[in-house]
């Protein structure tokens, strides 16, 4: 089972976290018609310093697509945005590493 997890690596909490996710691409062979998933939106009030929250499950049926996560959050009164894109077929066991805050193996995108 694969999950998308937001990890706060800051020394202070982040608040008002808004995550938008979507998948898109040209099919498994790269030659097919355009494919895209629904756009999903998630909100989290706070992630404490060094904490994490599970955003959503990631389905293996979507690994052949670009999987994009756009994260907006506040530290104090300052807003930040980050975009994370998992390229097609990058979510594979060969790319697993130890993710210390979770105590699990996974694929870390920074």
Q: Language-model segments: what does each one mean?
A:
Residues 9, 24, 75-77:
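Short, flexible beta-strand-to-coil junctions
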Residues 1-7:
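Short beta-strand elements of extracellular/lumenal beta-sandwich folds
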Residues 56-110:
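Terminal connector regions
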């Amino acid at each position: 089972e694969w999950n998308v997890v937001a990890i706060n690596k800051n020394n202070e909490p982040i608040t008002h976290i808004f995550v938008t996710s979507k998948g898109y691409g040209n099919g498994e062979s790269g030659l097919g018609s355009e494919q895209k998933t629904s756009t999903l939106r998630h909100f989290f009030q706070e992630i404490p310093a060094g904490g994490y929250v599970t955003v959503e499950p990631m389905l293996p049926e979507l690994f052949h697509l670009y999987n994009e996560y756009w994260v907006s959050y506040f530290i104090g009164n300052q807003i930040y945005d980050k975009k994370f894109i998992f390229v097609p077929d990058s979510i594979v066991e060969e790319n697993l590493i130890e993710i210390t805050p979770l105590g699990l193996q996974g694929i870390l995108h920074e």
